[in-house]
Each structure stands twice: as C-alpha cells, then as structure tokens.
C-alpha cells in the first residue's frame, strides 16, 4: 500500500517512494499523467497547483465532502467499533470560498534571489514562497492588504529572513478578519536584527510608520481595528510572539457566533471558518441537548478550550461548563 500526498482518487500519476515502514510506503508526487473522472471543475484560484494551500479545487464541492467523509470514516474505523453505524457524514460549510478569518503569510522569494514574495509555501518546497494575491479562500480585503504590504517592502528593498542563514528582517504577515463584525487585525512579524539595504541602515520606526500609513489608505470593505508589530527571533519557521507593539488601534477584535460576541487577540485560537464554526457548535449543542433549561444538571468539560468559544456556546444547555486551557493569552482573551 502506497500513499501519495496531493493526489485525488482516480488520477494516474508518476511518483517516487521516499518512505517505507511496516508494509506501507509513502510516495512523492512527480507528475499527474491523467485526471480523475471525479475532476470536472476548474480550479477557482489561479495559484492552485503551485501554492501548497489547497488540494481539491478541481473537484466539485459535493465530491470534496464525499472524499472527506471517507477519510474520516477510515480514521474512525481504526478506533471505534461499528463506526459505520454511528458516523453521520460531513456537514458542509455555508460558504465555499472567501470563508477564512485568519491567514499567516510568509515573506521570502519564489526563486533564489528573486523579488520579494509574500504568501504561501510553494507545493513541495520548504524555501520558495508564492505571492497569493488572488487567493480565493479569503475575501478581497486580505488580497488588498497582502498586495499593499509586499509592494511597500519591495519598494524599500527590505530583506526577508533567510531560514538557513538566520539573517534578515521580514518574517510573516498575520491578518485576521471577523466575518460578522468585519473588524480587521493586521500584524507584521519581524526579527529584531538591524535593517540593512544596499544603501545602508534603515530606521525601523520610520519604516513601520510608512507601512501603517500605506494600510490606512486602502479602501476596504471591513474596518481596521488594529495594526501591530510583533518581534520574533526564534529559528523555527513559525509565528511566535516575543513582544508586540500597537502601531494603530488595539490588539484585539470581536467576532460573533450564535448570538455571542468573542474577543480575539492576535495569537489566540479561534476556528478559521466562522460560519462553519457555527454549524459545528450548533451540532455539538444539539448532541448534548439544546434544552436551554435553567434546571439542567449536566456538567460540560471543554478540554483544550482556547478562548472558551465552545464552553460559552454550550453553557445554556448545562448547569456547569468548565474550560481547561494551558495558553494564558487564550484564557485572558
């Protein structure tokens, strides 16, 4: 049995085996030779196939749901007796495109020594970055913010952080936008290294002020709640908070789910599909009995509770709800 990532059932592909273990193997995709009969949709995004973010855009959405249902059921069969009898299938997202409320973009280049890029990792590459300024899983405000940011820092010739040399300034751009309130939080993540270009040293505060001013001139559908600058000198290629300053506004925004309002900070966990989360949480509430009965005797434990979203949404259906979370920032939010 060989598993090949980034493929669709029914495709004819060429691949090389790069892992073997206990009678199973993993293969690395080289080329798609023939499409699957299931693929009758054109990819909605021009970056599809190059960007490593999405896998199934050439499948109609209903086929994507069937594929996911099969994958989940196989996982359940390994640990749940008679899984087929209790599995209820997949509930679809109310919105297929433009649904995300958070994106973490990475600075880099698409080819070695090429122009500054800002976006997602190229499929199969640890180093190359694709500028996803036409990405379809976010709305137009994200695309405008990304485009303005990469254009500004390109014009200033600001170096990105090289993951092998551990040199450079620009690391990530974090953008969060509430679907219901349309509030936007923008956070630039950089190192604390001196900013140097071919023309010499750059004043960081003037650079950040210019970026902030550029963002504030954008015509957006939503409203900017805050513009932030976070420092991160960790060697890991991940967004980490080693100190955040507010360049404009505040360091949080609000989102609404099922009639409740939630305060979200830059790094607190929140489901990335707000409308899909409402479906998820409403289903969970129905499972435990959405009685809204003041005499309810149930106690609900929300483990790994993050900002306590599930705990608060389930609270009308229980006498006590207890959230358990190790991340202090999420609890404080």
Predicted region positions:
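Residue-level signal for inorganic ion chemistry
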Residues: 10, 54, 173, 227
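Short, aliphatic-rich beta-strand segments
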Residues: 175, 182-192, 261-265
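Extended interfacial segments that mediate partner engagement and assembly in macromolecular machines
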Residues: 33-43, 49-162, 180
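Short edge beta-strands and adjacent turn/loop segments
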Residues: 167-181
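Terminal RNA-binding accessory module
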Residues: 1-47, 123
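Short, conserved phosphate/pyrophosphate- and ester-handling motifs at nucleotide-, phospho-/glycolipid
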Residues: 10, 138, 273
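Rossmann-like S-adenosyl-L-methionine
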Residues: 194-333
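Internal alpha/beta scaffold segment
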Residues: 127-171, 192-228
